[in-house]
Design a protein with these regions (language model features):
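Mid-domain catalytic core of redox enzymes
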Residues: 10-19, 252-367
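N-terminal glycine-rich phosphate/pyrophosphate-binding loop and immediately adjacent elements
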Residues: 22-146
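Rossmann-like flavin
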Residues: 123-205
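A glycine-rich dinucleotide-binding beta-alpha-beta segment and adjacent secondary-structure elements
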Residues: 187-196, 412-471
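Helical element adjacent to the flavin cofactor pocket in flavoenzyme catalytic cores
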Residues: 212-262
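C-terminal segments that line or cap access tunnels to active or ligand-binding sites in enzymes
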Residues: 321-427
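A conserved FAD-binding loop/helix module that cradles the flavin
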Residues: 466-488
Length: 506
């Protein structure tokens, strides 16, 4: 097996072909139509959801993915020994059940189950929780000594937040209003959300309130069966609804004419369309695929000010066949040796805080009964981008060793119990997704307004990706895909008296 130097190897062995060298390479666009109603660029959850809704409504939809499989960051890789690792299957709110039922199918919805053992361990406190409003209310009143009235007001305030609220209050100010001087409570409330979407105490409070309240509704959920099963079922649903899905198809240009979007260039081939939904990075959509010359000067200025969110590192650990991890270890473990919650410490290359995701056999009940652990940390692109190969490999090995050191507290003698370990860095995320700076959470809050205003700049151009923190994560991505697909349907059906009946029914 050969792999790209410095990167986590992909799950496709690169084998010398037995075909004659004069064979033509496969045409991944063979059989495509010359024109579609909609081209969706990128098959992350937002892209796939948009494509599925529009295909179900009867529109001609072409879904283009540059990678060799669908899913975006909702992905996985396999290793010998029946090991399958999920990249980002680490918990989402209950709302995912409702969204999948309405916009996908019951086969997907029925596999969503709750994680009931969310564990915190740091110098300030150590506890286990079901991570919902009822349990957090008990914790805040009994263990942290906050009055029930204050807790109720805090939860009600967070739950009542929406995009149209005052955006000047920061998350830090929100916490100080209800829990002044309580860094331990800030840590309890903020640390998991920072891991979930890269948000900080300096971001607008509404970005925290909306995401936190989604989780507090009924807790943390996961897809039982693994990301590979989820994406396989989504791909089958896309096919059922007439979506033309193509992998290994890299869009280099979105074509713009006097009246708006007119097509895309993919693998060197021009395909016409009436609308484009980009599920790619917002900045690369604007500045690379379209080009700044097609936008108003003020819009370009605003787009240039959009900050990318941080990246991530992960360490994947497969246990030996005979090893079992007690379920009392937890499903998600937020552990830290840092004395207090600090965003910069969560990003620092000298890692003090990690999330361990424990995968028990029930995660993939139909596969071999194997245990696995994935460690995730937030990371800065700058700490990895400019390392030479020797430095890069040494830094990856250090990441692995320090992760095993941290795991030892929770899984004693872990090195003897693990048969395979690999690491991914911001460079890995960049390599496989093409996200600028390896961003694993899209953009900061200001990216949402820029993303939403694309159709006002260029008729037929839309974006449905991870932006503004609110639209990050599995649920945020799916819901943004829903919002954008409805707008595209309305645009396509403007000459009709009403939107497509299938969309209207949703």
């Amino acid at each position: 097996v050969f792999h790209i130097a410095g990167e986590t190897p992909c799950d496709e062995p690169l084998i010398l072909s037995s075909r004659p060298i004069f064979d033509m390479p496969k045409d991944f666009l063979a059989g495509t139509l010359p024109e579609y109603d909609v081209v969706v660029i990128g098959s992350g959850l937002a892209g796939m959801t948009s494509a599925n809704i529009l295909g179900r409504a009867g529109h001609r939809v072409l879904l283009l993915e540059q990678h060799y499989k669908l899913g975006g960051l909702a992905t996985w890789f396999k290793r010998p020994g029946s090991h399958t690792f999920d990249i980002s299957l680490h918990g989402f709110p209950y709302g995912m059940i409702k969204s999948c039922k309405r916009y996908w199918n019951d086969a997907i919805t029925s596999n969503i189950v709750q994680l009931k053992n969310i564990r915190f361990d740091n110098p300030m406190f150590s506890l286990m929780t079901t991570y919902n409003r009822e349990d957090f209310t008990k914790l805040l009143t009994s263990q942290f000594g906050v009055s029930e009235e204050t807790v109720v007001r805090f939860f009600d305030t967070a739950r009542g937040m929406n995009f149209y609220d005052d955006q000047s209050m920061t998350t830090r100010e929100l916490f100080e209003k209800f829990f002044p001087g309580r860094e331990d409570i800030v840590r309890l409330l903020m640390e998991p959300i920072t891991y979930a979407n890269g948000s900080t105490l300096e971001d607008p409070a509404i970005t925290y309130g909306i995401v936190f309240s989604n989780f507090m509704a009924k807790g943390v959920f996961i897809y039982e069966g693994g990301t590979d099963d989820l994406v396989t079922k989504m791909q089958a649903e896309l096919t059922k609804n007439g979506v033309d899905t193509r992998i290994r198809c890299d869009v280099s240009k979105i074509l713009v004419g006097p009246k708006g979007v007119r097509g895309v260039v993919v693998n060197g081939k021009e395909i016409r369309c009436k609308a484009v939904i980009s599920n790619s990075n917002l900045r690369s959509t604007i500045f690379q695929m379209v080009g700044p010359e097609h936008f108003d000067a003020k819009f370009v200025e605003d787009a240039q000010e959009v900050r990318l969110n941080n990246s991530s590192t992960q360490v994947y650990m497969a246990m030996k066949p005979e090893v079992e991890i007690p379920e009392s270890t937890g499903d998600l473990l937020f552990c830290s040796t840092a004395p207090a919650f600090r965003t910069d410490l969560l990003l620092d290359r000298n890692i003090t805080s990690r999330t361990f995701s424990f995968y028990y056999p029930r995660t993939r009940p139909h596969g071999k009964q194997r245990h696995a652990i994935v460690s995730s940390t937030n990371a800065n692109w700058s700490d990895w981008a400019d390392l030479n190969e020797e430095e890069y490999e040494a830094s990856k090995q250090d990441l692995i060793e320090t992760t095993l050191d941290a795991l030892e507290k929770y899984v004693p003698n872990c090195r003897d119990k693990i048969e395979l370990v690999e690491a991914a860095t911001p460079r890995t995320f960049h390599h496989y997704t093409k996200h600028l700076a390896g961003a694993s959470f899209g953009t900061k809050f200001e990216g949402l307004a820029v993303s939403r205003s694309l159709p006002q700049q260029i008729h037929g151009l839309y974006h449905a990706g991870s932006v503004g923190i609110i639209m990050s994560g599995w649920l945020g991505a799916i819901n943004y895909g829903v919002i954008v697909s409805n707008e595209v349907d309305q645009m396509l059906c403007r000459s009709m008296s009403s939107p497509s009946p299938a969309i209207q029914a949703q």
